[in-house]
């Protein structure tokens, strides 16, 4: 059987995960996560992990919030899961909206040297002492190319600083000169881009639902771990605002409104990235039904649904 992969991506709250769960009801497949926050355990509500994780769901909630994780480590894990799916003759369906993970999947990763733990510690301590804005300015002062990074993307600016400190060379230079080897050749990339008004309404409603369930308890759990605010899991949608609410710095509804606004802005940036950074043969869909119908039409005959599934 041909080694195929389907990638279903899109902005936060677009409905891609729900679409994949519906696809899995009619297709013999594995749903493999490529969301950089849904990898963490202990925060399923905050990170909007599948409500009922089945044996077909892979790479959800398996990383400790305190663990230092990266797109490179995720790529190793996803290669293993994809190979296992192929060995079991089921279709790997990779879903999530994290640009770093999607980019590493479709374009590969540059061969940047490993960062010394002391360099990483120094960079993180400097970020904590300076704050995000001043840290970004310090980075740009040393590497003008870093101005191309978004100042609120803490992970990227921290990574750029670490690489510059470790190697003396801009991360952009590494990206340009290091050959990227694509991990997979036969990826069909599908993007779910609902109309903006529907997407924003879904974001607003989803965050209210999160706040009414266990999101606050999950943030309390993260705070009990004494994680720095620049830790990746602390950047989950709503986490910074809930922390401020729990610390008495803002009111409940203010936290809700700020989180909704920040998430809408993030979704807007995601939409721009999907339209400009993905391969030219990427296909775009405006509704769940369209993307579900496409996947089933393309793959149902090759991967018919069976009553028993491998439990690897």
From Swiss-Prot:
Which GO biological process categories is it annotated with?
tRNA modification
Which residues are listed for ATP binding in this entry?
10-17
A Pfam family of this chain: IPPT
- Which cofactor is essential here? Mg(2+)
InterPro entries on file: Dimethylallyltransferase, IPT, P-loop_NTPase
- Highest rank taxon of the organism: Bacteria
Enzyme Commission number(s) from the entry: 2.5.1.75
Q: Which reaction does it catalyse?
A: adenosine(37) in tRNA + dimethylallyl diphosphate = N(6)-dimethylallyladenosine(37) in tRNA + diphosphate
State where substrate binds.
12-17
Q: Which UniProt key words apply to this protein?
A: ATP-binding, Magnesium, Nucleotide-binding, Transferase, tRNA processing
Where does the record place the site Interaction with substrate tRNA? Answer: 98, 120
GO molecular function per UniProt: ATP binding; tRNA dimethylallyltransferase activity
Spell out the subunit comment.
Monomer.
Q: PANTHER family, per this entry?
A: TRNA DIMETHYLALLYLTRANSFERASE
- Known role: Catalyzes the transfer of a dimethylallyl group onto the adenine at position 37 in tRNAs that read codons beginning with uridine, leading to the formation of N6-(dimethylallyl)adenosine (i(6)A).
What HAMAP family does the annotation carry?
IPP_trans
What is stated as this protein's family in its record?
Belongs to the IPP transferase family.
Supply the name of the protein: tRNA dimethylallyltransferase
Originating species? Anaplasma phagocytophilum (strain HZ)
Name of the encoding gene = miaA
């Amino acid at each position: 059987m041909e080694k195929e992969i389907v990638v279903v991506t899109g902005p936060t709250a677009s409905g891609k995960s729900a679409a994949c769960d519906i696809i899995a009801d009619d297709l013999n497949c594995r749903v493999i996560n490529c969301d950089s926050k849904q990898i963490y355990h202990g925060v399923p509500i905050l990170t909007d992990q599948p409500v009922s994780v089945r044996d077909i769901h892979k790479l959800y909630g398996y990383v400790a919030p305190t663990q230092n994780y990266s797109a490179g480590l995720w790529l190793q894990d996803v290669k293993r899961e994809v190979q296992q799916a192929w060995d079991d003759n089921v279709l790997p369906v990779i879903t999530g909206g994290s640009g770093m993970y999607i980019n590493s999947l479709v374009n590969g990763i540059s061969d940047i040297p490993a960062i010394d733990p002391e360099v990483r510690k120094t960079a993180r301590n400097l970020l904590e002492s300076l704050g995000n804005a001043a840290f970004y300015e310090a980075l740009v002062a040393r590497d003008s190319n870093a101005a191309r990074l978004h100042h609120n993307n803490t992970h990227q600016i921290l990574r750029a600083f670490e690489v510059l400190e470790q190697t003396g060379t801009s991360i952009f230079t590494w990206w340009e000169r290091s050959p990227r080897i694509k991990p997979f050749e036969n990826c069909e990339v599908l993007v779910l881009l609902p109309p903006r008004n529907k997407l924003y309404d879904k974001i607003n409603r989803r965050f209210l639902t999160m706040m009414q369930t266990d999101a606050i308890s999950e943030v309390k759990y993260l705070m009990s771990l004494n994680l720095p605010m620049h830790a990746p899991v602390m950047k989950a949608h709503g986490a910074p605002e809930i922390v401020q609410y729990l610390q008495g710095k803002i009111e409940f509804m203010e936290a809700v409104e700020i989180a909704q606004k920040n998430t809408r802005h993030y979704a807007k940036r995601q939409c721009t990235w999907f339209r400009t950074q993905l391969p030219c043969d990427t296909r775009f869909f405006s509704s769940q039904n369209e993307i579900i119908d496409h996947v089933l039409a393309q793959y149902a005959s090759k991967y018919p649904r069976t009553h028993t599934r491998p439990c690897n």
